[in-house]
Regions:
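Well-ordered alpha-helical scaffold segments within catalytic/enzyme domains
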Residues: 22-30, 47, 51-58
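Active-site-proximal loop/short-helix segments
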Residues: 1, 47, 67
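An aromatic- and glycine-enriched ligand-binding surface/loop that stacks and positions planar moieties
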Residues: 13, 38-42, 50-224
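Active-site-adjacent "gating/activation" loops or surface patches in catalytic cores
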Residues: 220-235
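Conserved, well-structured interaction surfaces
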Residues: 1-38, 188, 205, 209, ...
Length: 235
């Protein structure tokens, strides 16, 4: 009914997870052709894990506010809370993780193979790799289908750049965080040293070599607003 009162947030999110459960029950494990390009049981699990994680953390950190006046609630004889949602996220994630593994290849021979460039390569593969991929989109540039993306042009023409705040979230290679003092006195190139290796495979750093190129590319302010040029998805 159009005049029905709004359902409580917790009830709605409980139903979202129930829908994911129904999808998991009814969807196939894999499709006969192009399995990574169709919604499957794995996709349902991934969506449930993300939705439950978001709601669980939201309720945990907003409990007692106007958004979540009460953390623990009962709907249809089921008690929900931040803990309940987080456990649902764990259960869905564990079931999915057991079916997948991290991509570790370097089939494109991206420069920097010795330092493991698999993270950078994973996001520019011509064909989705089933090792880690849950759900992918098939692109085709022929004259009939023309399913394309233009993210490389967006990066170049609009100079999309990572913010300093975003960059500062990358931890050291040993898993520890930088102090405010360390970050304040660190040069641009020094900020990549001893850092989570995914940083240099997401943002252009020292020794960056474009795919298909042989020599390192110098940082150009024509492609970035602040020096932190994003290279993820660029092939």
């Amino acid at each position: 009914s159009l005049n029905k009162p709004r359902d409580p947030r917790g009830y709605v999110m409980m139903k979202v997870l129930e829908d994911c459960d129904k999808a998991y029950e009814r969807l196939p494990e894999a499709w006969g052709s192009g399995p990574l390009f169709h919604v499957s049981k794995n996709a349902a699990l991934a969506l449930k894990a993300r939705a439950a994680l978001f709601e669980g953390t939201f309720r945990k950190y907003h409990a007692g506010s106007e958004f979540v006046p009460q953390d623990e609630q009962v709907f249809e004889d089921k008690t929900i809370s931040s803990t309940w949602f987080l456990q649902e996220a764990v259960n869905a994630a564990e079931k999915l993780i057991g079916k997948k593994a991290l991509y570790t290849g370097n089939t494109m021979g991206i420069a920097g193979k010795a330092t493991n460039a698999s993270y950078r390569e994973y996001f520019v593969l011509e064909v989705a790799d089933p090792t880690e991929t849950i759900l992918a989109r098939a692109y085709n540039s022929d004259d009939i289908v023309q399913v394309r993306h233009g993210i490389q042009f967006d990066y170049k023409n609009h100079k999309h750049s990572a913010t300093t705040r975003f960059v500062n979230h990358y931890l050291k290679s040993d898993g520890k965080a930088y102090t405010e003092t360390e970050l304040a006195t660190m040069s641009y190139y020094d900020s990549f040293k001893g850092r989570d290796p995914r940083m240099a495979q997401t943002i252009q750093g020292p020794g960056y070599i474009g795919i298909g190129d042989k020599a390192p590319e110098q940082l150009s302010m024509e492609r970035t607003l602040n020096g932190y040029r994003v290279i993820k998805y660029i092939s």
